[in-house]
Amino acid sequence: MEALSEQEIHQLAMDVVGRDLKDKSFEFLTVNSKPKKNPQFVCLKDKKLHFIVVNAILYPKNPVVFDTTLMNQVKEHGDKFKARTYYAGVGFAHAQDYQKPLSKNAPYVVNYDGLQEII
């Protein structure tokens, strides 16, 4: 089976977070699906601006752990716009063998605990 590319895995993470944001009634202003271009989502909710950084993480790494330097930089940028800043880590693993890479047409497991606000 053909392994998924970094961009394809990032797109899976974007889909997970995008569905979560939609379910929570966020209004999408900007969506950027490039993995290293932050933030990936700029949204409005209750007339407040929100910056969301999405990161796809492969097992065995923990999707809740983030790069504090990067997130502080994004928060500083968000503060200029009076935006709240969030990290959304989405973990993935091959469903049948966590040691295998993710591949096309193979099931996978998702580990997503929601948005973590950067304060």
Each model region followed by its residue ranges:
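Acidic-basic catalytic patches of nuclease active cores, encompassing PD-(D/E)XK
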Residues: 1-31
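Asparagine-biased alpha-helical interface segments
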Residues: 5, 62-63, 75, 89-91, ...
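Short coil/turn segments at beta-strand junctions that form active-site/ligand-binding loops
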Residues: 26, 48, 83
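Short acidic/glycine-enriched loop/turn segments that link adjacent beta-strands
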Residues: 35-38
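Active-site beta-strand-loop-beta-strand hairpin of nuclease catalytic cores
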Residues: 42-53
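Short beta-strand-loop-alpha-helix junction that forms the active-site gateway
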Residues: 52-65
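Short, charged, amphipathic alpha-helix that recurs within catalytic cores of restriction-modification
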Residues: 64-81
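Domain-level recognition of nuclease-like catalytic cores that cleave nucleotide substrates
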Residues: 84-119
